[in-house]
Amino acid sequence: ANGGAGKVIQRSKIIVEQDSMLKAMMIACRHANGKDWWLVKQMYEYSPGNLKSKNKIATFLVTKDSVYPPVITYFQDFLFSDYDQAGQAIFNQDGTKYAATCRGTNKVFLADFDRCTGIFSNPKTYNVPNYSCHNPNDSSWVDSFTHGLEFSPSTQFLYISKSYNILQLDITDNDSATAWYHVAGLDTAWNYFPKYSRLSIGYDNKVYLGYVGAIRNTMSHI
């Protein structure tokens, strides 16, 4: 439409009723057919005066003609508790693994993804270790803010950014004592450090890292 520039041809189409979706952590993954896309959002249940995350993920099939009602995957594991918190959701490079984290939960959610059906399986929730943020007045709750995450090119490792630390999780290692590795912490005094932010893999297969507030004109990479 619009000479290839795009155009809104339908609006206000209701595709989800009764349930609502989390504000953050929307991500897309190409369908196995190579043409269509899956749009993925976590959901929350609403009751008057209470917002609570449900243990399910909605996957919408997006084609060139329409957006279809979601495929719903239910989980026993509790996901994230606050719909209004920031976070990040990602797929690995071949779209077979999904991971998500939400600021303030100090948890990482991991699952397999079927690009043919849009269904998740084999869910697992990790508790992210805390490290001292070197703030004598506040050494715990700030570092529980898991801001972002990204897979390594091989998918063996998952990198997680916290306010003052970068961690590596070996998802093939079932021993929590050896699966975690501390990659980086502060490179200056805590009160001058801008805090780590989202992660994203580049075309060069390096994992790039931003900073909260964007007060630096540079990025780091792993």
Residue ranges of predicted features:
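Beta-propeller fold recognition
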Residues: 1-113, 119-222
